[in-house]
């Protein structure tokens, strides 16, 4: 299906739609890497593993998805999570990274980005979808400032980010995860400045400011909780 605004629409995911998103993510990954031997047992293991992660992080996350207007199926997705600095992130388990290694001094807000994939069935100008998904996901970290975006990221995606003027820092050696060479990285919120400013005119929507308010409320709750613990 060709990419046009007449064929697709951007929206956000409800918690009840998580199984649909995880299925889309795994199937799209399998198709991208042409995994003809992807067994039912392997799919079930991956599905349950990712569902477990997303159920833990859903309430402090926003999932941006692209859906078809024709049959409402998901064709692209990305997740941005406001991290509480306590719950173990996927990157920590995969790369054996201690929490202390991620808590960089003088950084207030910590984020995790994931579930980023665009269906290969979309033809045409896919760069517009890419920019929109990234803009929505990165707008919160950019606006709240003093932030660090953490991710386990496919090497090709890291290279794409660099082409979009988004630099990243590699935390360790790559591994093969979900069939691709995956790097542990972080992106400082100030490194998002060029990308956000360059795309603000074409990508900013009212919904982005609504999302900012949600993240501000999360930040306030986490700050209050930490003071109560002290």
Model-derived segments and spans:
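Terminal substrate-recognition subdomain of acyl/acetyltransferases
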Residues: 1-55, 142-144, 148-230
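A short helix-loop-beta-strand connector motif used in the catalytic cores of GNAT acetyltransferases and
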Residues: 52-65, 86-88
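Conserved beta-strand in the GNAT
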Residues: 65, 72-82
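Active-site beta-strand termini and strand-to-loop segments that position acidic
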Residues: 66-69, 187
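Residues in well-ordered beta-strands of folded domains
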Residues: 79-81, 114, 186
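Acetyl-CoA-dependent GNAT
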Residues: 80-86, 105
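Short coil/turn motifs at secondary-structure junctions
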Residues: 83-85, 121, 158, 190
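Acyl-donor binding region in acyl/amide transferases
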Residues: 91-168, 172-183
């Amino acid at each position: 299906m060709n990419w046009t605004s007449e064929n697709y629409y951007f929206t956000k995911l409800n918690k009840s739609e998580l199984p649909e998103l995880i299925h889309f993510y795994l199937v799209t990954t399998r198709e991208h890497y042409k995994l003809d031997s992807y067994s039912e047992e392997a799919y079930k293991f991956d599905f349950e593993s990712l569902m477990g992660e997303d159920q833990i992080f859903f309430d402090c996350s926003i999932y941006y998805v692209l859906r078809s207007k024709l049959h409402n199926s998901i064709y692209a997705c990305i997740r941005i999570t406001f991290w509480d600095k306590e719950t173990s992130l996927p990157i920590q388990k995969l790369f054996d990274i201690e929490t202390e290694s991620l808590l960089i001094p003088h950084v207030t807000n910590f984020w995790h980005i994931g579930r980023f994939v665009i269906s290969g069935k979309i033809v045409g100008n896919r760069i517009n979808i890419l920019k929109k998904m990234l803009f929505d996901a990165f707008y919160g970290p950019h606006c709240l400032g003093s932030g660090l975006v953490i991710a386990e990221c496919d090497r090709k995606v890291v290279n794409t980010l660099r082409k979009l003027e988004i630099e990243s820092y590699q935390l360790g050696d790559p591994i093969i995860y979900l069939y691709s060479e995956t790097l542990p990285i972080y992106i400082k919120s100030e490194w998002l400045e060029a990308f956000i400013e360059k795309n603000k005119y074409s990508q900013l929507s009212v919904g982005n400011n609504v999302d900012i308010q949600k993240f501000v409320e999360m930040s306030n709750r986490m700050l209050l909780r930490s003071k109560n613990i002290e």
